[in-house]
Amino acid sequence: MVSAILTDKKRNLRDAYSSALIELGHKNPDVVVLDADLALSTKTKRFGTVFPDRFFDMGIAEANMMGVAAGLAACGKIVFASTFAVFATGRCYDTIRQSIAYPELNVKIVATHAGISVGGDGASHQMLEDIALMRVLPNMTVIAPADATEMEDVVPAIAEHEGPCYVRIGREDAPIIFETHGAFEVGKGYVLRLSLIHI
């Protein structure tokens, strides 16, 4: 059961993502990171600074990035592909479906700027349909981390999980819900509060 929930402290999930990627990169030389010209916004640029030979900026070519991710995964790499959620799922749906989900390749799509809180980017960058699009794909595991602490646990967990994953994170800082690490498991939920009424 989660006991420490919704403190006043906040952290950004993108910062947690980049920190966890760097830590994972030190432990596993098969981790490769791709980005689609948004590495400063997705925070993957930090990984590229530490591991320049394992970071590839694919430019404004999101569907091509997913195709490259599929190819690298087919060669045994653990691929993290990042861009904004609107581009990761909207522009790349067919490529993800045909080249990643159906062949069950080990690609981890980490999409930032999900939902409606995208700052000055406006309505054209908002993405509400991403969970629906990714959830219906065969073999795809969909994860929406609750906070930065959980995001730091999600990265190594999905690296260990064989098969495609879609991780959805927002742009803004989020309240800290989990004070400690280690509770996250792929496919498992949490009891937030016990009640007399169970729905």
Q: Where do the language-model regions lie?
A:
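Conserved small/polar residues in nucleotide/adenosyl-binding loops
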Residues: 197-199
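Short beta-strand-to-loop junctions in surface cap/lid or active-site-entrance loops
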Residues: 191-195
